[in-house]
Design a protein with these regions (language model features):
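Glycine-rich flexible loops
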Residues: 1-311
């Protein structure tokens, strides 16, 4: 089990963290204590944050229907999460749920999200994951459906705040297997594409987990636009990426690429833009490749049509 959120002793002798949450409450605490935690002012503030992020996900079309889910770890084994069958754009604080690390519901009138097991797997595998955001932003999800890992060394911001974005193999949503596939990647990555599914990001706050979702979606959108301009996308050099990694290291932001040789950075051998544009190259020359055999067939058909028209 992952470590509990950091806490400090209160004046009354209890254990309260910087969010004002009583860390002495556990999943096996008396129901009255769990209800008191669930309805406390500190947790209500976190409920409001989740509802706010849910609205932003919905407004940006990162979720549709009842899709997407959010969670915040409150204590060692108690987690606040979104309900199932509720639009993230219209959630209210009273809709949220309380669960333990096995997914058993502890409080809340609505049923917890079916995908909470993935959130809990992430929290167990990564002690720093105190908040998790899962959604289906269309551009990043497009990469996930295509099974294409977003290329690196194109825009500095994603390198600093996220880094390389891996793809977790597909598993049925809501199953323990899906959570385990994602959890295998969160020790080195804060944002993961889920094959044929969507995106999940984690951080110490739900706001920052959402920021990461925004960053990866904007990046994937930019990359897709770039591939349609009829030119080979430009990358900055491995040396420039190393400079960014040095900045991350000074800031204390982990990245598995820190310490690699320059020749091992910006490796996008698997990146193959799948869209070409019909914009002619400079000088009016066509960028399309031609098949001589196909051209011969086209010419023969054209000549035959012209001969018949003349006759």
């Amino acid at each position: 089990t992952a470590a509990a959120p950091a806490s400090a002793s209160s004046a009354g002798g209890g254990s309260v963290d910087e969010r004002g949450i009583d860390q002495s409450v556990r999943a096996n605490s008396p129901k009255a204590d769990l209800e008191r935690l669930f309805n406390s002012p500190a947790v209500h503030e976190l409920k409001e944050q989740i509802c706010d992020v849910g609205r932003r996900l919905w407004q940006r079309a990162y979720v549709d229907g009842n899709g997407g889910n959010l969670s915040i770890r409150l204590t060692e084994d108690v987690v606040l999460c979104t309900p199932t069958l509720v639009s993230k754009g219209f959630m209210k604080p009273e809709d949220l749920c309380l669960v333990d690390l096995d997914g058993n519901q502890l409080a809340g009138v609505k049923k917890r999200t079916s995908e909470i097991l993935m959130h809990l797997s992430i929290m167990k595998a990564q002690p720093k994951a105190r908040a998790v955001s899962h959604a289906h932003p269309p551009y990043a999800t497009g990469f996930a459906v295509a099974g294409v890992q977003p290329p690196t060394c194109m825009i500095p911001e994603i390198e600093v705040f996220i880094g390389r974005v891996p793809i977790a193999p597909y598993e049925t949503p809501g199953t323990p297997e899906m959570g385990l596939k994602v959890a295998e990647l969160v020790d080195k990555h804060n944002t993961v594409l889920m094959e044929n599914h969507g995106v999940v990001s984690w951080s110490n706050t739900i706001e920052d987990a959402y920021f990461k979702m925004e960053i990866v979606e904007a990046y994937c959108r930019t990359v897709l636009v770039t591939t349609q301009l009829g030119v080979q996308p430009k990358q900055f050099s491995p040396k420039h990426l190393k400079d960014l990694l040095d900045i991350k290291q000074k800031l204390g932001v982990p990245d598995p690429r820190i310490g690699l040789k320059e020749c091992e950075l910006c490796d996008n051998d698997e990146w193959r833009p799948g869209v070409t544009c019909a914009v002619p190259a400079k000088g009016g020359e066509s960028t399309s490749a031609t098949d001589p055999e196909a051209e011969t067939v086209v010419k023969a058909v054209t000549d035959e049509i012209l001969n018949r028209l003349k006759g």
